[in-house]
């Protein structure tokens, strides 16, 4: 009995330790691209992945498949690494994620980084009607035209990730807005595309002005630029500090597993104790039955001897009676 209980306890402790190790996950890393997530065809880009200070290895995945591996170069840069893409093409545009390892544990996957290549098609033309100066409450429509046939158009507002719109079209797409508010003012560009990550050159900027407001020179049209460094659209996670839950552990799952494991061990112990008690009870009942049978046998033998003695006495008395007569 004691060896069995000891073996069960050891098994429970080993399983608990193994499950505890497997369920521990490191906090997800952050991922970003420099100089931008929108890269002109042929240009280079760096993809950064930042994890915990104790990270020993980083892995980059592209469209769900392993892409590259990097290890921190020095102790001062243990918490981040750089993955270099020398030439951006339509084959390197898409969704990237990264992981890092610390000890025997691997982190969760980072948020997806959507890397876009531009400059694959002609430059589209963007205009707004009416405009570019409109009054509050008025309806406007942005039109994006591309000579080369495409399937999708994107309209982007400068520095606003939540203001990315897309429309399907062949050579032109319309983006209606309104009634306009002060939130609509700003500078817009459009792109043509055959998919979400391979875009044309950007259009010339078009600035939407709202009348009745104080003039803001920062919203005035700018000269065309050859790179998109100025257009840092947050299509994915920006560079920032590591998440506050850097010591995040799935306590709820661990506790539930421990409780379940403890219940199984307790049930096993109860079952063993019940089996032992039933076995002892059966042995005791068997012993009682044997003892009872022995007592009955002794009583029967005792009665038999008594009867033999009485019979012998009776026989002697019968033999003695005729002689006396």
UniProtKB/Swiss-Prot annotation:
One of its GO terms (biological process) is immune response-regulating signaling pathway. Disulfide bonds join 49-98, 144-190. Coiled coil: none annotated. Weakly expressed in spleen, heart and lung. InterPro entries: Ig-like_dom_sf, Ig-like_fold, Ig-like_Receptors_ImmuneReg, Ig_sub, Immunoglobulin_dom. Keywords: Cell membrane, Disulfide bond, Glycoprotein, Immunoglobulin domain, Membrane, Receptor, Repeat, Signal, Transmembrane, Transmembrane helix. One of its GO terms (cellular component) is plasma membrane. The chain crosses the membrane at residues 259-279. Glycans are attached at residues 139, 216. Cytotoxicity-activating receptor that may contribute to the increased efficiency of activated natural killer (NK) cells to mediate tumor cell lysis. Belongs to the natural cytotoxicity receptor (NCR) family. This is Natural cytotoxicity triggering receptor 1. It comes from Rattus norvegicus (Rat).
